[in-house]
Amino acid sequence: MIHIEHFTFNAFQTRCCVVWDDNGYCAFVDPGCSSPAETHEIVSLVESRDLKPVCIMLTHAHFDHIYGMAALAKEYEIPVYAHIGEMFTLETTNPAVCGAYGLPLPETFPMIKSISEASFNSRFYPVTGNDTIEVGDLRFEVIETPGHSRGGLCFFERTERILFSGDSLFAGAIGRTDHPGGDYDALISSILTKLLPLDDSPMPGSSSDSDMNPGSEASSGLSAKRHTSVKVFPGHGPCTDLATEGMTNPFLQPFNEPYDD
């Protein structure tokens, strides 16, 4: 079973999620804690729940999502999983935006290209859409969703029907694409072709309803979960679900589909 505690951190009201399984193995998703007091909230949760941190998962590396990354990675000696495309964000987007608004740059690490390059000071491990991140009994499928940033990712736990969408998809909105590395058409395409179809995807190890006794308790429980829309934890704002966004999000209606020439 999945357990999720989410926090709202820093001046940009960024959502950070701590997710763990029944055995206490946990991951930090987008740790935007920007002060010692905010970081202490995460540490206190880990201690009070007796959690065992496994990794940090970044949907993208914009400064407001990684302010607490270095402190937590060092505290628990854990890797940081992100897309290699976020090197552009770290080297170009963050300095440009933080410089324009007088914001501090977050501490970071160099990204390694292979496990053999790993060291204490190089904690970035690149992941792609072919990868799965294991956090105890939880399995997070990595979904590449470029558009808000070059290396944007979402993380999908298929059995629990939970999606961490970062700044790709919000309740009633999408992430902005006017920063360096942004691409509106790529973002819309990512959501329409990779995220919304997750609502119709099968659960792992499930049989079709016709293969089960329709009157059995197992059949009714599995069917109910399968037809529950995927819950979405965005990087900002309220949580939502894919069914609601597919029907009501104004950015995802047919007239907004990318132009194909």
Model-derived regions: residue spans:
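Conserved S/T- and glycine-rich ATP-binding loop of Class I adenylate-forming
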Residues: 19, 59, 145
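Conserved beta-strand hairpin/beta-sheet module of binuclear metal-dependent hydrolase folds
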Residues: 1-49, 154-166
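Active-site HxH/HxHxD metal-binding segment of metal-dependent hydrolases
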Residues: 33-39, 43-134, 251, 255
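Short Gly/Pro-enriched turn/cap motifs at secondary-structure boundaries
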Residues: 7-8, 122-124, 144-146
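Conserved Rossmann-like nucleotide-binding pocket used by diverse enzymes
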Residues: 5, 57, 141
